[in-house]
Amino acid sequence: MPEGGDNYLTPADDQMTMIATALGEPETGKQLIAEVDQAFEQAAAAHPGWKGKTFTAATKTADGWGAYVGGSDRVTFMQNLGFTQNPTIAAMQPDATGFSTSLSAENLDSIDADVVVAFPIFVPTAQLTGDPAFAAVPAVQQNRAVIIDGDLAQAYSLGTTTATQYAIGQLVPKLEQAIGS
């Protein structure tokens, strides 16, 4: 993390540039960034119907529910596919993490969007899918929620070039199933 940087808020491209430069391979870093950019561009071009559709990136932890706000690579990932962040979530202030906001079960309906990408963190997926408040969200009721876990959730969250390419390849078909092209 650069001096004065915020934990978990250094953009993926900046991370790759710093790492590649430190390893004496700045051109390799530029190439990897270009490959990710191209993968996003191709996926977005193949799904013009996603442009402007709203999304929420949500998570269930042992502490409860949360949603990612601007500054998170999880938000940027979806924006790179053409989606627009759910304005209700976008207007919320981040908590101490700087990149997410906590949500009570009573306010969980605020995650409703054209598509919801949700994943568990350090809890079984069943705690997410079995939560009655989550099941009551319209996007969930209408099968417009994509639940990810395991390697895909890790890749979606990690933000490295290799992880992002994997996540694009795995998540795009799931988004297609949820909301079409």
Give, region by region, the residue ranges found by the protein language model:
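Alpha-helical, coiled-coil/dimerization segments enriched in small aliphatic residues
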Residues: V69-F99, L152
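Short helices/loops that flank or line small-molecule/ion binding pockets
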Residues: S102-D112
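Short secondary-structure boundary/capping segments
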Residues: H47, V75, A136-V137
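Extracytoplasmic substrate-binding proteins
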Residues: M1-A62, S157-S181
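General small-molecule cofactor/ligand-binding pocket signal
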Residues: T56, N86, A145-I147
